[in-house]
Amino acid sequence: MPVSTVFLEGPYKVDFKKPWPSEAQQRAAGAEARTRLNRRALGVWEPADEERDPVDVVMAVAASRQAGLIPLRTARMAVSPFTFYRGAAQLMATDLGSQPHTGIYAQMCGDAHLSNFGIYASPERTPVFDINDFDETSQGPWCWDLKRLTTSFVLAARDNGQAGRSEEAVRTAAGAYVAALNEMAGLGWLERHHRMVRADAPVARGVVWTGKMTAIVNQVVSKAVKRTQAWTVGKYTEVVDGAPRLRIDPPVITAVSRRTAAAVTASLRPYLESLSAERRAYLRGYHVVDVAHKVVGVGSVGTYDYIVLLMGDGRRDQLLLQVKEAELSAVKTALGERPRLAYGERVVVGSWLMQGISDPFLGWTQLHGRSFYVRQLKDMKGSHDPARLKGSALVGYAYRCGYTLGLAHSRAGDPHFILGYVGKGAALAGAMWRFSQAYADQTERDYGRFIEAIHEGRIKAAELAPAAPETTAAAPAKAAKAKPKAKAKTAKTKAKAARLKAKAAKGKAAKLQASGGAKP
């Protein structure tokens, strides 16, 4: 039975007569978890099934999505091993679900790779840095989030020609995670929940950024603070026949039928019921003037996602909301657990629990018989381009993300359980480095098979993906057992080949990713 550091997913039950376990009890429970899985074993990666087909797992996620957009999703994932990794949250969750874990549960992001951290505005219009994607959020093993994060740094480093700095980045992220847990352990419940990280300041005392990191942060923050609602409205709207309308830009932004627009508008009524009374009051003066469909992200391509233009008191008072489909969490699927909340509500509750401050208009609804969540579209949002994370900037960003993840796990629950398991953190850092290397190699092999599947016509991409690796992605199981050294060498060769071929086609494919891709 897992030890949960947080309240179970709703409905929440609070017993004011029953005290929460003491710090000593929590740490003892965490230390006891080492008997189930020692800290060195946390760094082991071995696929439970040598014959597993990563392509099947990745494409199974798309079965319930809009078929016409799946080739675009495939093309975006095919840019590089890192973009493949971004779109393969279900694959990694499935892999981790086949491995032993500590038994200590936390509220997870569920997809905590480095590109799912970023900048957004607090209600006071202060730019804050935090996790910004909770599509896969769920209760689950805390270490899954950390493994997802550290592996993403290895893949991004390799993609940027910074493989030599990847170990430092991974160990730094793991160390920062433990530092955040220790800091939050000294605070009360409310203090933890309200602990925020300003986007333009180092995340912790005693941390000194290099000039390169400072320059990158300042540039990203400077861009983000200009992306207000007014800026967003200007980007996504135009005046047609004297009236404001959403700017159609296929295939990323497309028009919808009147019937769909009416359904989306109707879905905002139950959405209002998910908001607090004062939030509902804020929206009472707005009415819907236009609706469009938007293609988002990498792994999310193919889900239903709408942008809604609302008008308030004149043309200067416009608001853009995003109505985004939520699916079953990859974490829940991997653990074989039934969901306790509607998918959209799960995303919202996970955001509330893990973020220092959340979008004031965050809520949930139902549409097309599917679950959705609603939020503002791009209110002072910004993110760091992985391609710019080189040298000390890569390591500095690793610290920022690891620290932020530690804060998020602590806000949602009690850090003493996890600290009881990890101890001072040196063993954890070593384990994360060993795991991240091994799983990055696995991802590159899986990426190679994904590219092969595209070129063989097994799956369709919106535009030609990088050339298939010259060798097959996986050696037969018998040969692998007979010659383990040969297998390791072959795996490295294949991984290197996949990286080189991906880089050769990266320029063209990167344009596809940035623009939204060719029309399916």
Where are these predicted regions, by residue range?
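Long, low-complexity segments enriched in small/aliphatic residues
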Residues: 197-267
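Compositionally biased, low-complexity repeat tracts
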Residues: 6, 26, 89, 230, ...
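Polybasic, lysine-enriched low-complexity intrinsically disordered terminal tails
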Residues: 1-13, 21, 28, 35, ...
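Conserved ATP-binding subdomain of kinase catalytic cores across diverse folds
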Residues: 18-109, 114-225, 270-467, 471
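Polar low-complexity intrinsically disordered regions enriched in Ser/Thr and small residues
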Residues: 33, 237, 245, 409, ...
